[in-house]
Design a protein with these regions (language model features):
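Bacterial Sec-pathway N-terminal export signals of envelope proteins
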Residues: 1-64, 112-125, 129-131, 233-273, ...
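Sec/SRP-type N-terminal targeting helices
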Residues: 18-22, 35, 74-101, 114-140, ...
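Amphipathic alpha-helical coiled-coil segments
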Residues: 19-34, 144-167, 178, 185, ...
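Small/polar, glycine/serine/threonine/aspartate-rich low-complexity segments that form flexible
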Residues: 46-112, 239-248, 279-280, 284, ...
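Periplasmic alpha-helical coiled-coil/stalk elements that build and connect Gram-negative outer-membrane
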Residues: 132, 138-257, 367, 412-413, ...
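Short helix-capping/hinge motifs at transmembrane helix termini and TM-loop junctions
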Residues: 190, 230, 399, 439-440
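Metallo-beta-lactamase
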Residues: 214, 263, 423
Length: 448
């Protein structure tokens, strides 16, 4: 399995990653709640009352039915409708006054904020805050995914390192077995000394013990990876290291891509939006209240009267201006300064994150370039050690070299081969680290 395949299974099965998706959904529902603030609000009331007229002391029965419906528009204006029915029945009344009297009123009113609340600043900022909450949840989720991916890189590379040591030890065992078999055949002819056989056997037993210890380490690492991937504990695991280590972009392009992916940069963007939101709200709070209110309606009045019944109706309407001012603005000024300081801090952190990203990318690229050079050197070292061992084996077969030297040369070749493999693995680690910085790993690994 490649690193991407391992990470995909970890992502699909890791419990805490599912929790981050729940957090994002909760934040998204906040946007729905904010949007509902523009919905219609319905209020109604009904009541009866027996009282005494404050003017003439006449017992009076009153029935009242009232209903109104209103909503705030996205512009900040408020539209409302009202309907009202009143029935008044007094024990006595003046001539000409209807008794009982029934009055009705239906109307519409419209409130237009001219300063504080204009453009519905509060709602707009609440909407932005909801969007910011979603962005924050997504940034937190991205950060968790990157942390898991970084942990999987370490686990995968550690497992690959153990695997490389196992393969290297197996090759060394095969060479020791060939040398032992050769010396046993020579001993059968009486031309090999006992010390040669003892030396080769000792080397072989040492390699076999080393392989046993490495196999124990591999089993523990395999179980750990299988647990993360949600696989059976005893499931077989074959690792396949990436062979394509090409970069293909310059540092500036990489920095731009890393900036777009960076969870830290996303969090700072969220903080900037929060600061801007707080600034707008603080500025709006400092404004005077100046509202223009229109109303229009239709009223009727009817009832029994002497000498004739009453039935009147009239179209009514009006306009008024409402004004209000806070006399102590120090609290609003403090809020405004806090928002400005919050934004300044976010800007400074943004500069630091960009600087860290640039240095991280430059550092990884330098490590990759140095790693490529080191890998090339190790490849040449392996070729030299192999040639040296081949020449020593030929001399050994002609009796011109001893067993000590052959064992030494085999150990040196095994060390060179292991160093080459380990350097290749470390180079792979740097490549995966760079791909994670750039966010490229998530183009292959799918996230729900």
């Amino acid at each position: 399995m490649t690193y991407e395949q391992v990470l995909q299974q970890v992502v699909d099965n890791y419990p805490s990653l599912q929790t981050t998706a729940i957090a994002v959904e909760r934040a998204r529902l906040e946007s729905v709640r904010v949007e509902s603030q523009l919905g219609w609000q319905l209020n109604a009331k009904a009541g009866v009352q027996h009282d005494m007229s404050s003017t003439f002391g006449t017992p009076t029965d009153t029935l009242n039915l009232n209903g109104n419906m209103s909503r705030m528009l996205e512009s900040g204006d408020t539209l409302g409708f009202v309907a009202d029915i009143n029935r008044l029945d007094a024990d006595s009344s003046f001539p000409g006054a209807p008794n009982p009297a029934l009055s009705t009123n239906v109307g519409v009113n419209y409130r237009m904020p001219l300063q504080k609340g204009a453009d519905n600043t509060s709602f707009v900022q609440n909407r932005l805050q909801a969007e910011v909450a979603v962005a924050q949840a997504n940034a937190d989720r991205r950060n968790v995914y990157d942390q898991i991916a970084a942990q999987v890189i370490d686990l995968y590379i550690n497992a690959a390192t153990i695997n490389a040591r196992i393969e290297n030890t197996r090759l060394a065992i095969q060479r020791s077995q060939r040398l032992l078999k050769y010396n046993q055949s020579r001993a059968g002819l009486g031309i090999a000394e006992d010390k040669d056989l003892l030396q080769v056997r000792a080397q072989l037993r040492s390699r076999e013990a080393e392989l046993t210890a490495l196999d124990m380490q591999w089993q523990a690492q395999r179980i750990n990876l299988n647990r993360l991937m949600g696989r059976d504990v005893d499931a077989d695991l074959q690792l396949q290291r990436a062979t394509d280590i090409s970069i293909g972009k310059n540092t500036d392009d990489m920095l731009q891509q890393a900036t777009q992916h960076s969870p830290a940069m996303a969090v700072i963007d969220v903080r900037m939006k929060q600061a801007d939101t707080a600034l707008e709200l603080s500025r709006d709070k400092r404004k005077d209240k100046l509202d223009l209110v229109f109303n229009a309606g239709y009223k009727t009045l009817s009832g029994d009267s002497t000498p004739s019944d009453v039935s009147e109706n009239e179209v009514v309407g009006g306009v008024q201006i409402e004004f209000g001012r806070g006399l102590d603005l120090s609290g609003y000024d403090a809020e405004l300064q806090q928002a400005q300081l919050l934004r300044s801090a976010a800007l400074q952190d943004q500069k630091q994150v960009l600087l860290d990203l640039r240095y991280n990318i430059a550092g990884v690229l330098a490590e990759i370039n140095a790693g490529n050079a080191a890998l090339s050197a190790y490849e040449k070292s392996v070729a030299s050690e192999q040639a040296k061992l081949n020449e020593a084996e030929q001399r050994y077969r002609r009796g011109r070299s001893d067993t000590d030297q052959l064992i030494q040369f085999e150990a040196q070749l095994a060390t060179a081969e292991l160093n080459q493999d380990l350097q290749s693995i470390e180079l792979t680690r740097r490549i995966h680290k760079l791909q994670l910085l750039l966010g490229n790993v998530w183009k292959t690994v799918k996230v729900e």
